[in-house]
């Protein structure tokens, strides 16, 4: 669809979302639109520093975890000594951007609101790593902490996965991977999914929404996919197109959050409708007036803070 045929999104978003969009960081260089992925990663990390400030303090530990691909960094956020469960967080960034620093505030708030240990996994980015390496690294980290739970003083009897955007896909894909391959890493009590993509190739919201303001034009989405997948056949893998997986049985309880003006919104709606149709435990909540990636902006947006609280509350209700 031609850009002029799309909705005038920036006129329709909420007042608090407009404030975020109009927030300038004078010390930031311009976005390197034609730069290398390395330059874009560097910019993204710098840009997120402002939004990560002021997060709650808590005990934090970092560990390198062995996988068949090499060492992967993890970061543990421990709000209390006797955590009722452990929640693994997978950051978004289109599979090509992001790290544990860019999503630090999100993980800290999630730990604070749930009172569970949150473990961020710094999976290898694409295109250096191709599907399914990130999922295999996440699963390896889960297995490692399950085996070493006593040494690390964490509760791995009940676990969960959480993620935003591409991280939401990785969160649900990892939970399904554990189920399908019958890997025991503790009971998966819940999965928290904020504005993820789950396998649609086209949709109404993808046609009407997406632009330079969110980095989710049709061309952007194609670029992320080409960086992440190894070959064309991967598009139909049940761990990339999650709608090709069996969503009729033993899916952990899912909290599915949608942003009103997100081109990926129909992915979330379809996931919810599919799970609900097959009596799989799930909850869907739409956050009005929001753009994709709004979870980052809790410094300025009450809605972002609410979305994190909602996810934390859903998870603790499953314990």
Swiss-Prot record:
InterPro entries: AB_hydrolase_3 (IPR013094), AB_hydrolase_fold (IPR029058), Acetyl_esterase (IPR023508), GDXG_lipolytic_enzyme (IPR050300), Lipase_GDXG_HIS_AS (IPR002168), Lipase_GDXG_put_SER_AS (IPR033140). It holds the Pfam family Abhydrolase_3. Its EC number is 3.1.1.-. Its main location: cytoplasm. SUPFAM superfamilies: alpha/beta-Hydrolases. A motif (Involved in the stabilization of the negatively charged intermediate by the formation of the oxyanion hole) lies at residues 91-93. The keyword Cytoplasm applies. GO terms for molecular function: carboxylic ester hydrolase activity. Homodimer. Interacts with MalT and MelA. Keywords: Cytoplasm, Hydrolase, Serine esterase. PANTHER family: AB HYDROLASE SUPERFAMILY PROTEIN C4A8.06C, ALPHA_BETA HYDROLASE FOLD-3 DOMAIN-CONTAINING PROTEIN-RELATED. This is Acetyl esterase. It is found in: Cytoplasm. The keyword Cytoplasm applies. It comes from the Bacteria. It is an enzyme of class 3 (hydrolase). One of its GO terms (cellular component) is cytoplasm.
